[in-house]
Amino acid sequence: MVSIPEYYEGKNILLTGATGFLGKVLLEKLLRSCPKVNSVYVLVRQKAGQTPQERVEEILSGKLFDRLRDENPDFRQKIIAINSELTQPKLALSEEDKEIIIDSTNVIFHCAATVRFNENLRDAVQLNVIATRQLILLAQQMKNLEVFMHVSTAYAYCNRKHIDEVVYPPPVDPKKLIDSLEWMDDGLVNDITPKLIGDRPNTYIYTKALAEYVVQQEGAKLNVAIVRPSIVGASWKEPFPGWIDNFNGPSGLFIAAGKGILRTMRASNNALADLVPVDVVVNTSLAAAWYSGVNRPRNIMVYNCTTGSTNPFHWGEVGDYLNHSFKTNPLNQVFRHPYVKFYSNNLMLHYWKGVKHTVPALLLDLALRLTGQKPWMMKTITRLHKAMVFLEYFTSNSWVWNTDNVNMLMNQLNPEDKKTFNIDVRQLHWAEYIENYCMGTKKYVLNEEMSGLPAARKHLNKLRNIRYGFNTILVILIWRIFIARSQMARNIWYFVVSLCYKFLSYFRASSTMRY
């Protein structure tokens, strides 16, 4: 069987979502590890006055592509930016571009999607379902297409606790929903959305389930594969550890925790934190397309790209590793020392949110107003709480994903491909991964220089000393109040002080005897 780089040699690839986190990493990996690929057609829309070519060039100039630039300086010649708007009829392709794509494309990687959990249903259907259907219809016209690779989500069927590598029946017929949305106004759509999505937490998950069914039904005559990643996080190894460039998903919460703003949130400490590194998702996608292209399986291949069943990791551990990582390598100008703790009990959660989030925010804003500055902390906390609501469903529940196809795929790789396209998450060391993830948020999201670490540590130590001093003064004041009113409290106070004095005297005497 040919290797993965050999399979992609001379191939023309069509990629959607190249400006997104996953799409960027896939583009970089494809060009670096399969250097003999012929060309990559990247569907990109105009945005903020930038042409598709300018947007692609901006991506290629980023740090993500540093390694590729060193290894293959001429890689840009293989990338062809094509003006396309996935939400428009026929993808808004020009006739010339459409003809080139139809004649040349061998493999499609469909990574584009709206990943906003609070997206309104109409827009989510437009990009996640209708755009996918239009791309399938375009693929049916392609003369040399070998594989259609669709990137979905492992949570598409989160209404089930055990999820196999199959496409389940949709919650509603996508065609009927699309037809209905055409005559509904926005108010009506918003009113019926909760009833439509039912036991799914948001429109993103709901529409990704519909998209899978569209791919299965409309692409019945195509060679289709679906990869379902769980919570996509920073890179594990490639192109370098800890690569992340956005605030989406856990990254924003990690940064809020590192800044000392996030102190508590709803999560079950024993629930599985099914994080999967972005490079594992990319490697799985490239390998899955290779397998389908070489073996031409009769049925659609679905791959649950998850970690929980093979290398379980829990939210309680996430909190512990976050606290340790950000105390060792703090972010610049943290608000408080990093310490986040998860609660599943409603009473405890609301109590600590009030004590650790709301009250400090109000006090800081009051101080800012008194000094003539603009208050900002309470707005930040409010936005943080809204973001937490969208993630609580995933931090409070666990699922079991069947990964037989992923295991089969791993066994099909030759020794060299297993190294180059590593998908074996059993080798993943979570403490090291979270540490690199935290460092990645510092370097690549917040753009903080590593040379500033000594100053950041000094600032963190200063905050620690202030906290210790404040707590000491608070304890003394409380005890003084009780001592002034109670003989019993005075007796307890003097007893404790006496014990401390005796302990210190004994410690001093023991130290002297040793020498």
UniProtKB/Swiss-Prot annotation:
This protein's source sits in the domain of life called Eukaryota
Give the way it sits in the membrane: Single-pass membrane protein
Q: Which residues lie on this side of the membrane: Peroxisomal?
A: 484-515
Provide Cytoplasmic-side residue ranges. 1-465
- Where does the chain cross the membrane? 466-483
Q: Which InterPro entries match?
A: FAR, FAR_C, Far_NAD-bd, NAD(P)-bd_dom_sf
| GO biological process, alphabetically ordered | ether lipid biosynthetic process; glycerophospholipid biosynthetic process; long-chain fatty-acyl-CoA metabolic process; wax biosynthetic process
Which catalytic reaction applies to this protein? Answer: a long-chain fatty acyl-CoA + 2 NADPH + 2 H(+) = a long-chain primary fatty alcohol + 2 NADP(+) + CoA; hexadecanoyl-CoA + 2 NADPH + 2 H(+) = hexadecan-1-ol + 2 NADP(+) + CoA; octadecanoyl-CoA + 2 NADPH + 2 H(+) = octadecan-1-ol + 2 NADP(+) + CoA; (9Z)-octadecenoyl-CoA + 2 NADPH + 2 H(+) = (9Z)-octadecen-1-ol + 2 NADP(+) + CoA
Which compartment or compartments is the protein found in? Answer: Peroxisome membrane
Q: Name one Pfam family in it.
A: NAD_binding_4
Instruction: Name the cystine pairs.
Output: none
EC?
Answer: 1.2.1.84
Gene Ontology CC: peroxisomal membrane; peroxisome
Annotated SUPFAM superfamilies: NAD(P)-binding Rossmann-fold domains
The record's region (Necessary and sufficient for PEX19-mediated localization into peroxisome membrane) falls at 451-507
**Coiled-coil residues:** none
Q: Which UniProt keywords apply?
A: Lipid biosynthesis, Lipid metabolism, Membrane, NADP, Oxidoreductase, Peroxisome, Transmembrane, Transmembrane helix
> Quaternary state and partners of this protein?
Interacts with PEX19; PEX19 mediates the targeting of FAR1 to peroxisomes.
Family note: Belongs to the fatty acyl-CoA reductase family.
Q: What does this protein do?
A: Catalyzes the reduction of saturated and unsaturated C16 or C18 fatty acyl-CoA to fatty alcohols. It plays an essential role in the production of ether lipids/plasmalogens which synthesis requires fatty alcohols. In parallel, it is also required for wax monoesters production since fatty alcohols also constitute a substrate for their synthesis.
Protein name listed in UniProt? Fatty acyl-CoA reductase 1
Q: Can you name the source organism?
A: Rattus norvegicus (Rat)
* Gene name of this polypeptide: Far1
